[in-house]
């Protein structure tokens, strides 16, 4: 059943619709066993609580607000398990994430990111330790970088990355219904978005 057909049946014969920009077949919630397996493969605790953000590291993305909110949430709720922020972004542009984290009292150990290998194209979720890291998968030297417009992950890999998360948060100062928000919804994540 299509939106075009529904609108036509309502008497709007001149209306046509276009398909959305997200290929929904790539984004879905993985079974819990697969989600745990991904965490274990990346040395992340089974019961850790992960808040994720998939974004281009631009100043219009409200990284300071997310860090401040995370710090307040931890201070007020005192979680009894490990918590992480997972930033799927390129660290060499935009916000100085570690510097901002320090301002809010957040340890660098609590911030994970996506590295992708320029040689084998496999990804790894781990703490940020700079660009040009050695790849544990293909043993490529200085071949791992944080995901960016020139070297990123495939849709099936991005789906796995969403499945590391327990909640998705997308704060920004301008823009619209951005693509990662919709992808996160397709993976059945609770999504927190700027109004």
Where are the language model's segments positioned?
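Short hydrophobic beta-strand element within catalytic cores of glycosyltransferases
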Residues: 190-194
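A short hydrophobic beta-strand element within the catalytic core of glycosyltransferases
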Residues: 168-169
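Nucleotide-activated donor-binding/catalytic signature segment of Leloir-type glycosyltransferases, i.e.
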Residues: 95-160
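Short alpha-helical segment that forms part of, or immediately flanks, the ligand-binding pocket
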Residues: 158-159, 181-186
């Amino acid at each position: 059943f299509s939106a075009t057909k529904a609108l036509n049946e309502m008497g709007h014969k001149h209306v046509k619709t276009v398909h959305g920009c997200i290929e929904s077949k790539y984004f879905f919630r993985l079974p819990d066993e697969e989600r745990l397996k991904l965490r274990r493969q990346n040395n992340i605790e089974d019961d850790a609580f992960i808040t994720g953000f998939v974004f281009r590291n631009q100043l219009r993305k409200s990284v300071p607000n997310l860090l401040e909110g995370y710090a307040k949430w931890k201070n007020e709720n005192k979680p009894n398990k490990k918590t992480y922020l997972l930033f799927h972004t390129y660290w060499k542009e935009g916000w100085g994430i570690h510097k901002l984290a320090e301002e809010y009292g957040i340890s660098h150990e609590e911030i994970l990111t996506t590295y992708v290998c320029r040689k084998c194209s496999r990804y790894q979720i781990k703490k940020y330790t700079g660009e040009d890291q050695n790849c544990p998968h293909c043993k490529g030297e200085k071949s791992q970088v944080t995901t960016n417009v020139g070297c990123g992950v495939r849709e099936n890999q991005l789906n796995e990355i969403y499945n590391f998360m327990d909640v998705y948060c997308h704060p920004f100062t301008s823009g619209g219904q951005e693509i990662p928000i919709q992808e996160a919804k397709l993976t059945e994540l609770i999504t927190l978005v700027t109004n």
